[in-house]
């Protein structure tokens, strides 16, 4: 039976947290619906981990309110722990125990019966391609397999809300794909997922996103609507000297922003028709350019644009 609830699975109002005079989370407000994958996106220091720890009830807020799975995270912390699962960046696997023994440990911790544990574990291990590794020591697993085992342990008691702190950092592409396939299957069961990530390409897999910077909420919407807010168009220039391209064009007429992405430069321009003009500007500056083409905007382009606007307005 689906676990969806008639009200928002997560409600956050004016949530704030300070450490030694530094504001880590500054007045956050957002809501997450039942059976939704909601992403907290931003660079290191954006407040993602602090927010998740407050939502999990392990870190008390200094101000504001948060309700998760129908529980006040401060006043009803004990009830909350039975309704959610929190998977921090370093999940507590026991490396001298096998995959099966780790799952059994967490099932016992949450009071999950044997029959329910075996049925749930069987489905989750099959979904993650780990059925044949039941008797392997956790310490002998790859990084991606450890994360998938951590997710299985976190889900063994069938939580209503799953909180994940950058679970795919350092994980190989195949394991990342498996991980997300499991998350989508959880949504089909009615589970709500709140996940933090610094991978902006991965963020596009979420149903909705909260873009964070320095503990503040910049924007919150679906990936498609967020990208639709980007002014102008995106042009990608490739060059053996990408930094010189960025520096030469950052303040050129019609250029709203310039971002280094590997060996390319993403230019946010008011009109892609400026490409010949920009190519002439590079030639005049003696900067080589192999190609310059209009492309579809990415979340990375949007984030850089939004941060630039915030800095320009003093935010």
What is each model feature region?
Residues 96, 137-144:
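Conserved ABC ATPase signature
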Residues 162-165:
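Catalytic Walker B motif of ABC-type/P-loop ATPase nucleotide-binding domains
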